[in-house]
């Protein structure tokens, strides 16, 4: 008889590289899992992926993210606990992961800012996104679109429109090709674009053409080779070849 898995014990994972904890990309891939994948691919950081099948059953994971949400990561660096023992560093919240990975690996500040002025711009847009478009866009994708929810969905739709208006105004400033910095993409672009694109707009019954600068920017982000790699991976996380074919991924 096959031994049952002990969901209270941390499973064996790679010890020589960062481990990213995510869920399977069915029924749909998530924007939050995509964000750390973007910076991992952009900075070519070695990593492995571990799939979480049940957030409620796999109680060992609650030590990695006390909010019991995905994604999260464990790095190879050790931290000391209050009891004096050592454990791997855990980072949760996708925006926190973007900042952490840049602090550790982006030595030139390409994606997080080369000085305090640039960093302030990047983190301002990143954190504002988490409170604005990140929250409203995620709720739109999660809620069932039935008649009883129409008033709530209308509120979320209007909030998404306001967020797109802000992006459109920002991109209308002279020389502003990207969201935070004018000359190059940053983690602010990585965080925002998964919820500012034609697919999300279409799901919210919003015509993305109404924000032409935002649409052009979103397409420019998609053309970045490392973003394309991250999205392809995110779309197929944990899926078999049969599932990939069935879902057209």
UniProtKB/Swiss-Prot annotation:
Look up keyword Kinase and say if it applies. Answer: no
According to its UniProt entry, this protein's organism is Claviceps purpurea (strain 20.1)
Question: Tell me, what does this protein do in biology?
Answer: Glutathione S-transferase; part of the gene cluster that mediates the biosynthesis of an unusual class of epipolythiodioxopiperazines (ETPs) lacking the reactive thiol group important for toxicity. Firstly, L-tyrosine is prenylated by tcpD, before undergoing condensation with L-glycine in a reaction catalyzed by the NRPS tcpP leading to the diketopiperazine (DKP) backbone. Afterwards the alpha-carbon of tyrosine is oxidized by the cytochrome P450 tcpC to form a hydroxyl group.
Q: Name one GO molecular function term.
A: glutathione transferase activity
The reaction(s) this protein catalyses: RX + glutathione = an S-substituted glutathione + a halide anion + H(+)
The record places domain GST C-terminal at 115-249
Q: Which InterPro entries match?
A: Glutathione-S-Trfase_C-like, Glutathione-S-Trfase_C_sf, Glutathione_S-Trfase, Glutathione_S-Trfase_N, GST_C, Thioredoxin-like_sf
Q: Which family does it belong to?
A: Belongs to the GST superfamily.
**Sequence ranges assigned to domain GST N-terminal in this UniProt record:** 20-109
Supply the induction statement. Expression is increases towards the late stages of rye plants infection. Expression is positively regulated by the thioclapurine cluster-specific transcription factor tcpZ.
For this UniProt record, give its keywords in alphabetical order, as a comma-separated list.
Transferase
* Statement: the UniProt record of this protein carries the keyword rRNA-binding: no
Q: What is the designated name of this protein?
A: Glutathione S-transferase tcpG
Enzyme type, top EC level: transferase
Pathway annotation: Secondary metabolite biosynthesis
């Amino acid at each position: 008889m096959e031994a049952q898995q002990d969901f209270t014990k941390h499973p064996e994972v790679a010890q020589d590289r960062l481990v990213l904890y995510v869920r399977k990309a069915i029924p749909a891939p998530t924007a939050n899992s995509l964000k750390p994948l973007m910076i991992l691919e952009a900075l070519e950081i070695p990593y492995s992926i571990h799939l979480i099948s049940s957030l409620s059953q796999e109680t060992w994971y609650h030590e990695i993210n006390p909010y019991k949400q995905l994604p999260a990561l464990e790095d190879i660096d050790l931290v000391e606990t209050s009891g004096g023992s050592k454990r791997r560093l855990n980072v949760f919240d996708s925006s926190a992961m973007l900042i952490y990975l840049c602090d550790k690996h982006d030595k030139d500040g390409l994606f997080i800012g080369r000085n305090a002025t640039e960093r302030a711009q990047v983190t301002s847009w990143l954190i504002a996104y988490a409170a604005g478009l990140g929250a409203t866009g995620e709720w739109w994708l999660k809620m069932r679109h039935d008649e009883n929810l129409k008033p709530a969905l209308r509120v979320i739709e209007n909030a998404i429109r306001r967020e797109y208006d802000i992006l459109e105004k920002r991109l209308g400033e002279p020389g502003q090709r990207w969201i935070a910095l004018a000359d190059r993409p940053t983690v602010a672009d990585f965080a925002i674009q998964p919820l500012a694109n034609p697919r999300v707009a279409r799901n919210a019954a919003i015509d993305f053409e109404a924000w032409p600068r935002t649409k052009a920017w979103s397409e420019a982000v998609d053309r970045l080779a490392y973003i394309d790699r991250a999205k392809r991976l995110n779309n197929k996380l944990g899926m078999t070849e049969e599932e990939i074919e069935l879902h057209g991924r």
